Each structure stands twice: as structure tokens, then as C-alpha cells.
Amino acid sequence: METTNSNYFGTEKISRILLKIAPPVMLAQLIQALYNIVDSLFVGKYSESGLTALSIIYPLQLLMIAIAVGTGVGINTAMAHYLGVHDEKKANEYGGIGTPLTLALWVLFAAVCFFFMPAYARMSTDSPEVIKDVIVYGRIVCVFSIGLFTESIWTKILQANEDMKTPMIAQIAGALVNIALDPLFIFGLFGLPKLGIAGAAIATVVGQIVAALIVMKKGFRKSPPLSVYPRDICFIYKLGIPNILMQSAYTFYILGLNLILATFSDQAVTALGLYYKWQSFFFIPLGALQTCIVPVISYNYASGRMDRCKKTLSTSLVGGMGLMFIGTLVFNLIPGQMLRVFTSDPQVIAIGTVGFHFVGISFIPMVTSLIFPVFFQAVGAAVKSSLLTVVRTVVLFVPLGYLFSRLGLNYFWFTFPVTEVITTLVGVFFYRRFMAQQK
């Protein structure tokens, strides 16, 4: 077991901390993003219906990740808090609850998804071919998601102990296995059976299991006595629910946007799905910052170093905006080329080109609207974190998407920049009130 350097988060220069712990996370997320792109590329070459099915399944995959990663973030934050007050025994107690808790979550999620999948597919599209692909792909990636659940928990345990290298290696290995298996299983190369969309799903879960096995040795902790489970689980979810809400809200707003776009065409749904594939690539810096600032802020807040909490927030915002400006340029300069990587459907390309222009504009304000909830989560302001997430995803995204869509498909894409600007303003208001209460 690796133990944390208890003074590092509290004494080292903030920019140096982030430069040390963020690159491994970024590299791992880069490989994950490349996997998402390559996975969709192979499926798109196999069939257009399969590509649409991936767009429809995407919200469910986000929900699965939200439950797993959000629980892991709760454990990570609890461990970082107790490490901040030099109580390593208590920190490891929370780590020990992680494995039994995540296995229970996996069983529950797998059972619900297996029985719910046909209804979800029929709700999302009228195409029989797409419905079939959704059911096949969705059932495999949900029922066999044990690798995703356990890897998420063990990764967060290691990150709480400043071990960013092992999770990076695990995620890279899992993604590379996935990428290697995709063409073999989808197209039936080297004498293997041609499995199509099912092959893509199998490659996904195999890669997840490989990643989980790599982090298991260092991430697994001995379970504490059952008597502490109720109290500790309540504390884990007090800290983790904001992240779960934030991530699962993505599920419901993307599902809502998919249903709105489905009133226009399946091609519109596919265009939105391709945006999220590319978004995962360009949001690597932001995702890494979200992951890395939580233990830093949580540690310093527990130690009474509010000045370092503020510095961590400002450093992540400035760095995130600078990096996301590159994404804004790319989405506005070469949207057609990005779409043609996956599809030759002229309708998808035409719809997506317009959409990419408007969505790219939203990247800069999106930095603040996504970093603020993480900050509030790390300092234990769960209500503010949750409210900000609800405002963005429930109050704004889907209602605005519906209203703009009534004006026409092109107007629908205004939803993204308008939502991010309003959320940023609300986040600034919450932050100022929080800081006033600290004086």
C-alpha cells in the first residue's frame, strides 16, 4: 500500500502540484478519448445503424460511470479529508468499504439495465435495426460492467494516496486492449466470428476488466467491520452525491436532447452523438483538472488553508480556459472534417457542421460551469454543488433545447452557449456567497 506524503498538498506550490498529478490523468484520459473515437470509427464503418445505437446508449454509459465514479469520488474525498488531519487508519477504513459497495452497485445496475433495455431502445427510435443494435450493445456493456465499477473505485483510492501512475497505466492498457480487439471482433478478422455491434461491446468490457485487474493489487483495501458500514457509507455519499448528480444529470439531459432531436431525424441524433465523441477528446484538460483539484482542495480545506483552496480554483480556471480555447478554434475551423472521420452521410455532416460551430463557442464558459461544482464538492458545500448541476442540466439544458428547437433545428444549437453562460453567472454568485461566509 502506498501512503501519502501528508505535507505535499499543504505546502507545495499549487501550480507544481497540478503539473505533477494532472499529466498522468490527462494521458490516461487521452487514451480513453482515442478509444471512444476509434470505437465509433469502427462501428461507423460497419453500419450507420450501429453508430446511431452508440449515440442512444451513450446516456446509459454516462449513468453507469456517474454511479461508479461518483461513489469513488466520495471515497476519495473522505480519504483525502482524513489524510489531511493525519488519520491514515480512518482513511483506509473508507477505502476498505469501496470494493463491497461497488460490487453491490454493479449487480443492481446490471439487473435493471438488462430488463429495461428493450423499452429504452423503443423509446429512443422507431428504426427496427437501430432498436436491435441498442439492445445487443447495451445489454453487454451494462451486464458485464464489473470492470468499470471496480476500476473506478480502486482508481479513486489510489488517487487519494497521490498514486496517479498506476491508474494511468491501467486505463491506457484497458483502452489499448479495447482498440486492438475492436476490429477483430467487429469484422471477424483472423478467423474469428464476425460479431458486429456485439463485438464492439465485448471489446469494451474486456478492456475495462483488464484495467480493473491492474489497479486491484494496490487499490484493494481490507474491509472494515460491518458495524461502521452504515455511518461511513452515509458520509461517502454525502461527499459523492454532488458528483453523482452532476454526472447522472448528463445522462438525463443528453437523453432529453436525443429525444428532442429524434423529432427531426435519426441523423440529428447521430450528429449530437458525434459531438460528444469529439468532446471527450477536447475536454481532457478539463476532466483532468476536475479529478486532480478535489483531493488538493479537500486536504487544504480540512487543514484550514482557504488561501490555497482559492489558489487551486483560480489556477484551474485560468489553465482550463486557455486550453479549451484550442477546442473552440478546432470546432469552428474544421467541423466538416471531424464529422467525416466517422460518417459519409451528407445529412449528418450538414447538421453537425452547424451544431459544432455553436457548441464550440460554449467551451470557454463551460470551464467555469463545470469547475465550480467540483470546488463546492471538495469543500463540503454539497447543496451548492448539487444546485449548480441541477440548474445547468435540468433547469436550463433540456427546457432551452426544447424552446430553441421549436424555432428550427439550427436554432436548437443555441442551447449550449446560452446554458453555459447562465450557469457561469450562477456559479460566480454561489462562490461569492460561500467566500463571504468564510470570513
Please state what every model-predicted region is:
Residues M1-A22, M79-I146, L192-I241, I297-S362, ...:
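Short alpha-helical transmembrane segments in multi-pass integral membrane proteins
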Residues F9-L41, K45-Y46, L62-G74, A78, ...:
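N-terminal transmembrane alpha-helices
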Residues K20-D39, I140, E151, G174, ...:
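Transmembrane helical elements of multi-pass membrane transporters/channels
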Residues L30, L34-T52, A121-P128, L184-L195, ...:
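Helix-terminus/linker motif at the lipid-water interface of multi-pass membrane proteins
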Residues L51-F115, L148-E162, T166-P167, A271-L329, ...:
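Small-residue-rich hydrophobic transmembrane alpha-helices
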Residues G72, V141-Q159, P167-A175, A200-L213, ...:
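Short runs within selected transmembrane alpha-helices of multi-pass transporters and secretion channels
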Residues C113, K156, D182, I186, ...:
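Structural signal for membrane-spanning alpha-helices in multi-pass inner-membrane proteins
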Residues S248-Y250, L396-Y402:
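Hydrophobic alpha-helical transmembrane segments in multi-pass integral membrane proteins
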